[in-house]
Each structure stands twice: as structure tokens, then as C-alpha cells.
Amino acid sequence: MIKMSDFLKDCFQKIGWEKDHVSFGDLPLFLKAMAYRFPFENRAVLAKENYKITKEELWRRLLKDQHGGLCYDLNGFLYFVLREAGFHVKLIRGTVYAGDQEGWALEGTHAAVWLSAENGDYLVDIGFGINLALQPIPLSGETVQSPVGSFRIKKEETEKGSYVLLMDKGEGWQIGYAFTLEESDLGDLDNMKDIIHSHEKSPFNKSLLASKLTPSGRMVMSERHFTIYENGGNIQKSDIGPSGFEEKLNTHFL
């Protein structure tokens, strides 16, 4: 077993992980702990924060400062954590499918993590908004379940990659994103971040948003509304004013 680094210690402390290691069997609980701790949010995009995606910078932003992030932050951080914990992982890129009306989103602007274990290869992702399986998804095609719905991977040639992540949240199987297994590097994540920050078709540079899964459901916030969805079906929606976003984010998400 590898000796636990300060980087891992800080991560484990932040998410409330009481073990001094993470095994493959631990990953469902570990990915839940990560998802419940770090919100999907875009303040850095709206503030035009200029930073490079490095292990040290993600450590500072997510563990020391009060930040969540988008896919390149959250899955970039997950990559470093899993690598440090002894897993064989690599960064990969995908293209989100925005629905039949809009088609494919900006090409190659979703970051995810490929993980190879003794019993097969998997996709792991804590940076796809609230669309999270909360466990490794087998590349071999088996379906996994989370409170959000069902997830599986299909090997299918598309114009955006040779695999697709499929989701069924109660309305039938739909494409979440297509991806390839070609390894990406930190420069690719920086490029992805620059596109998300500046491209006119980016969905994340128009207005503030935040979302996070919780043990009892999920929370979603825009500049005008804060909504709590509970797994039993109860919904609490409230209006927020100009200063309400930061206040609610600090109180409920961070």
C-alpha cells in the first residue's frame, strides 16, 4: 500500500473520508463523498479567473479556497486524487450531447477519467452536473444505478468518439456524451477551460449556476432561483436576489 501523501490527507479530510486509503471496492462510497462535497459551479468563468490547471492549483482551489468547479476542475482533481491513491487512470475528453434539438455541444469540452482495474476498464466522472452514476461505469456495457437514474456505456462510432455514455433518468435512454479513450493532458484541460470561458456557444459563460447531489436528493441554483429536490419527490423552490447566489452557495453548496 502506498504511503498517504499530504495531498491525499487534505482531500480525505475535506470530504470526511476516514480511511487512509481507497480500494476499488471503496470507489462508490468515495465518489459519493466527492460529489457531495464539491459543487458543479461556474463563478470562475463569470469572473474571468485566469488560472492554469495543475495539481497544485486544483489543491488550492478545491481544498483550501471555497471553490467547486466545472468538469475540468472536478475531474482534473479526481484524476490526481485517484492517481495518488494508486489507481491506473488517465484523463479523457468527450463531447456532450445537448439533446435532439441542439445536437452536439462544443467539441471536446467535457473532461472525464478512464480507470483500469484488474476486472476491467471504467469511466469515472464527478463533473457532469448532477448526472452522476456515483460509481465506476464499466466500459463493457453493464448498467449501473444511482439515485439520478441508470447509466451504461455503449461502444458506438459517432462523429465525436467511439463510445457513448447513456443515461436513463426515467424517460428512456439518452446520450449524455460521446468520448474516446485517447489520453488527454493538462494542456488539453486548459484549452477546454479557455473555450468554456470565451466561446459564444459556451453554456457556462452567460449566467451563474450551481448544482450538487446530496444524500437526500439534489440542489440546483441559478441567478434567480434556488431549488432543493428531495428523493421522495418534495421540491422546495425559492427566489433569490442579486446578492443571494453567493450567500446560498456558501451556506448550502460549499
UniProtKB/Swiss-Prot annotation:
Tell me yes or no: is Transferase among this UniProt entry's keywords.
Answer: yes
A GO molecular function held by the record: acetyltransferase activity
Q: Catalytic residues?
A: C71 (acyl-thioester intermediate), H110, D125
Q: Which Pfam families match?
A: Acetyltransf_2 (PF00797)
Q: Which InterPro entries match?
A: Arylamine_N-AcTrfase (IPR001447), Arylamine_NAT_domain_sf (IPR053710), Papain-like_cys_pep_sf (IPR038765)
Q: Which residues form a coiled coil?
A: none
Q: Which UniProt keywords apply?
A: Acyltransferase, Transferase
Entries under SUPFAM superfamilies matching the protein:
Cysteine proteinases (SSF54001)
Give the EC number(s) under which this enzyme is classified.
2.3.1.-
The record's family statement is: Belongs to the arylamine N-acetyltransferase family.
Name by which UniProt lists this protein:
Uncharacterized acetyltransferase YvcN
Q: Which organism is it from?
A: Bacillus subtilis (strain 168)
| Gene giving rise to this polypeptide | yvcN
